């Protein structure tokens, strides 16, 4: 069974919903299974640390989750065109995996949600790709053969699924965005199975 890690950070719930849809797509591929994980908030040393286990939702990711996965879907809200600090913090701690090439050759995709339509979706997606490329992962984009990519009037890019959440994070995922997330999960899982041989 090819285990696909769907790793995300979500504040208002939009990125979490996208992660669940990508996981749904993964689960539609025979021989693949999705594993949902999140990361704790990053707090200054003067603030209280996050609990070791989240009170609800997906468990926190550990390095062993990354090492064991056959593929990775990485999701973050966009903050000034970049991935959120908690995900960056996690990847800053992956040097031991990088040193032994634990992620090299594995497929990965990225997804995001932003509060404004031009809120840096594509640069956020690109910022998430950088550590994945350093790890030697194979980036799996969203091709224009996916018809919703050409038809969407909200989120969706060839770099990966995206969602326009609104400033209050109150915009639901559109039908086109939903279809793109599910298709991305299926594409990632299929690629993981092909690369495993």
What are these regions (language model features)?
Residues 104-154:
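Short, glycine-/small-residue-rich phosphate/pyrophosphate-handling segment
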Residues 39-44, 136-168:
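Mobile beta-alpha loop/short-helix "lid" or hinge segments that flank ligand
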Residues 1-102, 164-197:
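N-terminal beta1-alpha1-beta2 submodule of the flavodoxin-like/Rossmannoid cofactor-binding fold
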Residues 13-14, 72, 76, 82, ...:
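Gly/Ser/Thr-rich helix-start
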Residues 126, 156-158, 175:
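Glycine-rich phosphate-binding loop at the start of an alpha helix
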Residues 92-95, 99, 113-116, 134, ...:
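Alpha-helix boundary/capping detector
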